[in-house]
A protein has these predicted regions:
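Sec-dependent N-terminal signal peptides of Gram-positive bacterial secreted proteins and lipoproteins
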Residues: 3-24
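Bacterial lipoprotein signal-peptidase II cleavage site
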Residues: 20-40
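Extracytoplasmic "Venus flytrap"
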Residues: 33, 39-71, 79-89, 183, ...
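Hydrophobic alpha-helical segments within soluble ligand-binding/sensing domains
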Residues: 38-39, 133-175, 274-295
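An alpha-beta-alpha
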Residues: 45, 63, 151-198, 296, ...
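Beta-alpha junction/loop-to-helix N-cap segments that form part of ligand/metal-binding clefts
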Residues: 79-141, 232-259
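Pocket-lining segment of extracytoplasmic ligand-binding domains
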Residues: 185-254, 260
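Flexible loop/turn connectors
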Residues: 263-315
Length: 334
């Protein structure tokens, strides 16, 4: 009897311990609910930013602010890494995120998005500061949702309105140069859309592409010698080299219409601007829906900026003698 009683007591103790262990389990690490994220109610989000410049910095800041507000300061942690525009570094960063089994990856710009897509099919990936997800991910029959572990926000401003802006501010333009980095697929996509608008209006154009920052000076010099105006789409390489572009275009009196505010503030006359901070914040809201509310990322359509604003660069407009009509906001000097 005593032996049976002792055995029963030991068995009860073992079962109680096992149940307690199950109750404190951190789950499978998928990040599908706040209770099992990171084993302590905390989500870990890996952020890979392609390079440093104002637009991408603002998107990262907006994303983090949204996550902190929605999840709570103590419930989300960030591992923020900058790839400095290098493919090898980008791969290393993303692979480290995958090895660490982060709950979600924010891919800030096209290169991190493409790299993350190749690295994992399980961890949710949100892109931001990406123009066209279809071309970036090689999806031919693009419908707005990827059908896989990827979604995000697009920074594409209406191309037709950008072309209208160029014709409004530079009505005498007969030949327009399209300046972008040939290594950035999103830039090529925008260039093709812009060219179609120019063709429809009977305006001739010529492409000027740089493979990297080392070629920007020479191709920009060629552009100002052959064109009346220049269009630069959202392009990370160009955004990091606006001083070089401005030092050539401004003395040549060739106005630049820019695809985003960061480029415009450095070398442009005007832009149809989105707020990259707001775009990042919007992406943070998507992260909350995925991690905290269990929304299926595969069926989430890529979102665009809620609003766009006409903005101009007062200093460059004055230098070129361009009068800005009503309806434009001045870009504040830094």
């Amino acid at each position: 009897m005593k032996l049976k009683k002792v055995t029963a007591i030991l068995l009860t103790a073992v079962m109680t311990a096992a149940l307690a262990a199950c109750g404190s389990s951190s789950g499978d690490g998928s990040g599908s609910s706040g209770d099992d994220a990171g084993g302590s109610g905390t989500y870990t989000i890996g952020i890979c930013q392609q390079m440093e410049h104002a637009a991408l910095d603002a998107a990262t800041e907006g994303f983090q602010d949204a996550c902190r507000e929605l999840f709570g300061e103590d419930n989300v942690e960030f591992d923020v890494q900058n790839a400095q525009g290098e493919q090898t570094m980008c791969s290393t960063i993303v692979n480290n995120f995958v090895s660490s089994d982060v709950d979600l990856i924010l891919a800030n710009a096209t290169l991190p998005l493409q790299t993350a897509a190749q690295a994992t099919s399980d961890i949710p990936i949100l892109g931001t500061s990406v123009t066209d997800y279809g071309s970036a991910l090689g999806i031919d029959d693009w419908t707005g949702a990827t059908g896989v572990n990827i979604s995000g926000t697009s920074d594409l401003a209406p191309i037709e309105e950008q072309e209208d802006m160029l014709l409004e501010l530079v009505p005498e333009a007969q030949t327009v140069g399209i300046l972008y980095c040939s290594a950035e697929s999103n830039s090529k996509y925008q260039a093709e859309l812009f060219e179609a608008e120019l063709e429809a209006d009977g305006i001739s154009y010529k492409e000027y592409t740089a493979a990297d920052s080392n070629e920007i000076q020479s191709v920009t010099q060629n552009a100002v010698e052959e064109c009346d105006a220049i269009y630069i789409p959202t392009d990370n390489t160009m955004a990091s080299n606006t001083q070089i572009i401005n030092n050539i275009c401004l003395p040549a009196k060739v106005p630049v219409i820019a695809g985003e505010e960061g480029i415009c503030s450095g070398c442009g006359v005007a832009t149809l601007s989105i707020s990259y901070y707001d775009l990042g914040y919007q992406t943070g809201e998507m992260a909350y829906k995925i991690l905290a509310e269990g929304e299926d990322i595969a069926s989430m359509e890529v979102e665009t900026a809620a609003q766009v604003t006409k903005k101009y660069n007062p200093a460059i407009c004055e230098e070129l003698g361009i009068t800005i009509p009503e309806g434009y906001e001045a870009i504040e000097a830094e």
